[in-house]
Amino acid sequence: MSKVTSSTLLKYKQEGRKFTALTAYDASFASAFDGEGIDVLLVGDSLGMVLQGHDDTLPVTTAEIAYHTRCVRRGIERSLLIADMPFMSYATPEQAMENATALMQAGANMVKLEGGHWLLETVTKLTERGIPVCAHLGLTPQSVHVFGGFKVQGRDAENAQRILDEAKALEAAGAQLLVVECIPASLATAITQALTIPVIGIGAGATTDGQILVMHDVLGISSGYIPRFSKNYLKQTGEIRSAVRAYIEEVANGSFPSADHTFN
Protein backbone atom coordinates (compact mmCIF):
# COMPACT_ATOMS: atom_id res chain seq x y z
CA MET A 1 0.00 0.00 0.00
CA SER A 2 1.61 3.25 -1.15
CA LYS A 3 1.94 6.16 1.25
CA VAL A 4 -0.25 9.23 0.78
CA THR A 5 1.77 12.36 -0.01
CA SER A 6 0.91 15.90 -1.04
CA SER A 7 1.40 14.71 -4.64
CA THR A 8 -1.20 11.99 -4.05
CA LEU A 9 -3.75 14.55 -2.86
CA LEU A 10 -2.97 16.84 -5.79
CA LYS A 11 -3.61 13.92 -8.14
CA TYR A 12 -6.91 13.22 -6.37
CA LYS A 13 -7.95 16.84 -6.93
CA GLN A 14 -7.04 16.68 -10.59
CA GLU A 15 -9.04 13.46 -10.97
CA GLY A 16 -12.02 14.79 -9.03
CA ARG A 17 -11.61 12.11 -6.37
CA LYS A 18 -12.73 13.19 -2.90
CA PHE A 19 -10.49 12.32 0.04
CA THR A 20 -10.97 12.12 3.80
CA ALA A 21 -9.14 13.33 6.89
CA LEU A 22 -9.63 12.81 10.62
CA THR A 23 -7.94 14.01 13.75
CA ALA A 24 -5.98 11.41 15.72
CA TYR A 25 -4.04 11.62 18.94
CA ASP A 26 -2.74 8.12 19.71
CA ALA A 27 -1.34 5.05 17.97
CA SER A 28 -4.39 2.79 18.44
CA PHE A 29 -7.00 5.03 16.83
CA ALA A 30 -4.49 6.19 14.23
CA SER A 31 -3.82 2.59 13.22
CA ALA A 32 -7.54 1.89 12.86
CA PHE A 33 -8.13 5.02 10.77
CA ASP A 34 -5.06 4.36 8.63
CA GLY A 35 -6.09 0.75 8.07
CA GLU A 36 -9.56 1.70 6.87
CA GLY A 37 -8.19 4.14 4.30
CA ILE A 38 -8.29 7.62 5.84
CA ASP A 39 -5.96 9.65 3.62
CA VAL A 40 -4.89 12.38 6.06
CA LEU A 41 -4.51 12.32 9.84
CA LEU A 42 -4.20 15.57 11.78
CA VAL A 43 -2.73 15.83 15.25
CA GLY A 44 -4.89 18.83 15.98
CA ASP A 45 -4.65 21.39 18.73
CA SER A 46 -8.28 20.36 19.19
CA LEU A 47 -6.73 17.95 21.68
CA GLY A 48 -6.85 20.86 24.11
CA MET A 49 -10.63 20.60 24.08
CA VAL A 50 -11.39 16.92 23.43
CA LEU A 51 -8.54 15.41 25.49
CA GLN A 52 -7.56 18.05 28.03
CA GLY A 53 -11.00 19.56 28.68
CA HIS A 54 -10.18 23.19 27.93
CA ASP A 55 -12.77 25.58 26.51
CA ASP A 56 -10.56 26.39 23.51
CA THR A 57 -7.27 25.37 21.88
CA LEU A 58 -5.08 28.15 23.25
CA PRO A 59 -3.41 26.29 26.18
CA VAL A 60 -1.92 23.58 23.93
CA THR A 61 1.88 23.59 23.62
CA THR A 62 4.28 22.52 20.89
CA ALA A 63 5.67 19.84 23.21
CA GLU A 64 2.19 18.35 23.61
CA ILE A 65 1.58 18.32 19.86
CA ALA A 66 5.00 16.71 19.35
CA TYR A 67 4.19 14.00 21.93
CA HIS A 68 0.93 13.07 20.23
CA THR A 69 2.56 13.27 16.79
CA ARG A 70 5.09 10.65 17.88
CA CYS A 71 2.24 8.47 19.17
CA VAL A 72 0.26 8.71 15.93
CA ARG A 73 3.35 8.16 13.76
CA ARG A 74 3.93 4.78 15.42
CA GLY A 75 0.43 3.64 14.46
CA ILE A 76 0.29 4.48 10.76
CA GLU A 77 1.71 3.19 7.50
CA ARG A 78 -0.20 4.96 4.73
CA SER A 79 -1.86 8.20 5.87
CA LEU A 80 -0.29 11.64 5.44
CA LEU A 81 0.39 13.02 8.93
CA ILE A 82 -0.13 16.73 9.61
CA ALA A 83 0.70 18.38 12.94
CA ASP A 84 -0.96 21.57 14.13
CA MET A 85 1.25 24.43 15.21
CA PRO A 86 -0.27 25.70 18.47
CA PHE A 87 -1.23 29.22 19.46
CA MET A 88 1.72 31.65 19.35
CA SER A 89 4.18 28.96 18.26
CA TYR A 90 4.68 30.74 14.92
CA ALA A 91 4.35 34.42 15.81
CA THR A 92 7.58 35.12 13.91
CA PRO A 93 9.22 33.23 11.03
CA GLU A 94 12.13 32.32 13.31
CA GLN A 95 9.83 30.93 15.99
CA ALA A 96 7.87 29.03 13.35
CA MET A 97 11.06 27.47 11.98
CA GLU A 98 12.15 26.20 15.38
CA ASN A 99 8.77 24.76 16.37
CA ALA A 100 7.95 23.33 12.94
CA THR A 101 11.31 21.58 12.93
CA ALA A 102 10.44 19.94 16.25
CA LEU A 103 7.13 18.68 14.87
CA MET A 104 8.71 17.33 11.68
CA GLN A 105 11.33 15.54 13.78
CA ALA A 106 8.48 14.06 15.84
CA GLY A 107 7.15 12.41 12.68
CA ALA A 108 4.89 14.91 10.92
CA ASN A 109 4.86 15.09 7.12
CA MET A 110 3.49 18.63 7.17
CA VAL A 111 2.57 21.38 9.64
CA LYS A 112 -0.65 23.40 9.75
CA LEU A 113 -0.79 27.12 10.51
CA GLU A 114 -3.81 29.38 10.97
CA GLY A 115 -3.83 32.81 9.35
CA GLY A 116 -3.79 34.83 6.16
CA HIS A 117 -1.64 37.59 4.73
CA TRP A 118 0.52 38.01 7.83
CA LEU A 119 1.74 34.41 7.42
CA LEU A 120 3.04 34.68 3.85
CA GLU A 121 6.70 35.21 4.73
CA THR A 122 6.58 32.35 7.23
CA VAL A 123 4.98 29.96 4.73
CA THR A 124 7.62 30.77 2.13
CA LYS A 125 10.53 30.35 4.54
CA LEU A 126 9.25 27.04 5.89
CA THR A 127 8.64 25.69 2.39
CA GLU A 128 12.04 26.80 1.12
CA ARG A 129 13.68 24.92 3.98
CA GLY A 130 11.85 21.67 3.38
CA ILE A 131 8.89 21.96 5.74
CA PRO A 132 5.58 21.52 3.87
CA VAL A 133 2.75 23.79 5.00
CA CYS A 134 -1.01 23.32 5.25
CA ALA A 135 -2.70 26.71 5.64
CA HIS A 136 -5.99 27.26 7.50
CA LEU A 137 -8.55 30.01 6.80
CA GLY A 138 -12.10 30.89 7.81
CA LEU A 139 -12.95 30.08 11.40
CA THR A 140 -9.44 29.76 12.81
CA PRO A 141 -9.97 28.52 16.40
CA GLN A 142 -6.82 30.16 17.76
CA SER A 143 -8.48 33.52 16.98
CA VAL A 144 -11.70 32.66 18.83
CA HIS A 145 -11.44 35.70 21.11
CA VAL A 146 -10.92 38.03 18.16
CA PHE A 147 -14.01 36.59 16.47
CA GLY A 148 -16.05 36.77 19.67
CA GLY A 149 -16.73 33.04 19.64
CA PHE A 150 -16.83 30.12 17.24
CA LYS A 151 -18.69 31.84 14.41
CA VAL A 152 -19.10 31.30 10.67
CA GLN A 153 -16.72 33.52 8.70
CA GLY A 154 -16.98 35.10 5.24
CA ARG A 155 -20.71 35.66 5.10
CA ASP A 156 -20.47 39.26 3.86
CA ALA A 157 -18.93 40.17 0.51
CA GLU A 158 -15.93 42.03 1.93
CA ASN A 159 -14.79 39.23 4.22
CA ALA A 160 -15.50 36.58 1.61
CA GLN A 161 -13.26 38.40 -0.86
CA ARG A 162 -10.56 38.76 1.80
CA ILE A 163 -10.57 35.03 2.51
CA LEU A 164 -10.44 34.22 -1.20
CA ASP A 165 -7.54 36.64 -1.71
CA GLU A 166 -5.69 35.15 1.26
CA ALA A 167 -6.19 31.64 -0.09
CA LYS A 168 -4.61 32.63 -3.40
CA ALA A 169 -1.75 34.41 -1.64
CA LEU A 170 -1.01 31.43 0.62
CA GLU A 171 -0.85 29.13 -2.39
CA ALA A 172 1.52 31.54 -4.12
CA ALA A 173 3.66 31.63 -0.96
CA GLY A 174 4.12 27.87 -1.11
CA ALA A 175 1.31 26.24 0.89
CA GLN A 176 0.62 22.72 -0.36
CA LEU A 177 -2.79 22.26 1.27
CA LEU A 178 -5.51 24.54 2.60
CA VAL A 179 -8.13 23.89 5.27
CA VAL A 180 -11.23 26.11 5.19
CA GLU A 181 -13.45 25.99 8.26
CA CYS A 182 -17.00 27.22 8.83
CA ILE A 183 -17.42 29.34 5.72
CA PRO A 184 -20.37 29.50 3.32
CA ALA A 185 -20.45 26.68 0.79
CA SER A 186 -20.42 29.16 -2.09
CA LEU A 187 -17.16 30.68 -0.83
CA ALA A 188 -15.61 27.25 -0.36
CA THR A 189 -16.54 26.41 -3.94
CA ALA A 190 -14.93 29.60 -5.23
CA ILE A 191 -11.73 28.89 -3.29
CA THR A 192 -11.56 25.26 -4.40
CA GLN A 193 -12.00 26.25 -8.03
CA ALA A 194 -9.49 29.11 -7.81
CA LEU A 195 -6.64 27.08 -6.30
CA THR A 196 -4.44 24.42 -7.82
CA ILE A 197 -3.63 22.92 -4.41
CA PRO A 198 -6.16 20.65 -2.66
CA VAL A 199 -8.68 22.29 -0.34
CA ILE A 200 -10.01 20.45 2.72
CA GLY A 201 -13.30 21.58 4.22
CA ILE A 202 -14.90 21.37 7.64
CA GLY A 203 -18.27 23.05 7.83
CA ALA A 204 -17.65 24.34 4.31
CA GLY A 205 -19.98 22.32 2.11
CA ALA A 206 -19.45 19.35 -0.18
CA THR A 207 -17.49 20.89 -3.05
CA THR A 208 -14.05 21.01 -1.42
CA ASP A 209 -11.52 18.41 -2.52
CA GLY A 210 -11.49 16.71 0.87
CA GLN A 211 -13.30 16.70 4.20
CA ILE A 212 -11.98 16.64 7.75
CA LEU A 213 -13.74 15.99 11.05
CA VAL A 214 -12.70 15.62 14.67
CA MET A 215 -12.62 11.92 15.55
CA HIS A 216 -14.62 12.47 18.74
CA ASP A 217 -17.50 13.90 16.69
CA VAL A 218 -17.42 11.04 14.17
CA LEU A 219 -17.52 8.52 17.01
CA GLY A 220 -20.14 10.39 19.05
CA ILE A 221 -17.96 10.80 22.13
CA SER A 222 -17.74 14.58 22.22
CA SER A 223 -19.02 16.23 25.38
CA GLY A 224 -21.03 19.42 25.41
CA TYR A 225 -21.67 21.33 22.20
CA ILE A 226 -21.81 19.24 19.00
CA PRO A 227 -20.98 21.28 15.87
CA ARG A 228 -23.64 21.45 13.20
CA PHE A 229 -21.14 20.36 10.55
CA SER A 230 -20.26 17.08 12.31
CA LYS A 231 -21.92 13.68 12.07
CA ASN A 232 -21.98 10.75 14.49
CA TYR A 233 -21.19 7.76 12.28
CA LEU A 234 -20.83 5.34 15.19
CA LYS A 235 -24.53 5.78 15.98
CA GLN A 236 -25.53 4.46 12.56
CA THR A 237 -22.93 1.68 12.33
CA GLY A 238 -22.28 0.51 15.90
CA GLU A 239 -18.58 -0.20 15.35
CA ILE A 240 -15.57 2.10 15.07
CA ARG A 241 -14.07 0.73 11.88
CA SER A 242 -17.49 0.59 10.23
CA ALA A 243 -18.07 4.21 11.25
CA VAL A 244 -14.82 5.23 9.57
CA ARG A 245 -15.73 3.31 6.41
CA ALA A 246 -19.16 4.97 6.33
CA TYR A 247 -17.54 8.40 6.60
CA ILE A 248 -15.16 7.59 3.74
CA GLU A 249 -17.99 6.25 1.57
CA GLU A 250 -20.28 9.22 2.15
CA VAL A 251 -17.54 11.72 1.33
CA ALA A 252 -16.67 9.76 -1.80
CA ASN A 253 -20.27 9.63 -3.07
CA GLY A 254 -21.05 13.21 -2.10
CA SER A 255 -23.75 12.50 0.48
CA PHE A 256 -21.63 14.05 3.26
CA PRO A 257 -21.67 16.85 4.05
CA SER A 258 -25.35 17.39 3.27
CA ALA A 259 -27.25 20.66 3.43
CA ASP A 260 -27.85 20.00 7.13
CA HIS A 261 -24.11 20.23 7.76
CA THR A 262 -23.53 23.30 5.57
CA PHE A 263 -23.61 27.07 6.10
CA ASN A 264 -24.93 29.64 3.64
Curated annotation (Swiss-Prot):
Binds 1 Mg(2+) ion per subunit. The keyword Magnesium applies. Its cofactor is Mg(2+). The active site is at residue 181. It catalyses: 3-methyl-2-oxobutanoate + (6R)-5,10-methylene-5,6,7,8-tetrahydrofolate + H2O = 2-dehydropantoate + (6S)-5,6,7,8-tetrahydrofolate. One of its GO terms (cellular component) is cytoplasm. One of its GO terms (biological process) is pantothenate biosynthetic process. Keywords: Cytoplasm, Magnesium, Metal-binding, Pantothenate biosynthesis, Transferase. Its EC number is 2.1.2.11. One of its GO terms (molecular function) is magnesium ion binding. PANTHER family: 3-METHYL-2-OXOBUTANOATE HYDROXYMETHYLTRANSFERASE (PTHR20881:SF0). Homodecamer; pentamer of dimers. NCBIfam families: panB, PRK00311.1. Catalyzes the reversible reaction in which hydroxymethyl group from 5,10-methylenetetrahydrofolate is transferred onto alpha-ketoisovalerate to form ketopantoate. This is 3-methyl-2-oxobutanoate hydroxymethyltransferase. It comes from Shewanella sp. (strain ANA-3).
